[in-house]
């Protein structure tokens, strides 16, 4: 409904890829970004869009985190939490960070984890 072609990745609590969907026309480079958004959300237990607030004005932290492979610091990754237990993450890539996060939230709703 947003008019964007996306990639969607779901990882388990250990960050292992469990499911992946790619819409026709989705950018190839966003395959890995979707997987890494899911991995980041599963690893830290909060939305990837929250990293800006976590980092704040700490430029050294921002530089250091940007050098970490698989760590995504912009929106589109959400943790999967069931009955208070972190069980994985979902990552979406292909649109803007806001569009990606909206799609990830829709995925949570479908899974009954909103």
Question: Where does each model-flagged region fall?
Answer:
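Flexible, solvent-exposed loop/hinge segments and secondary-structure transition points
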Residues: 1-114
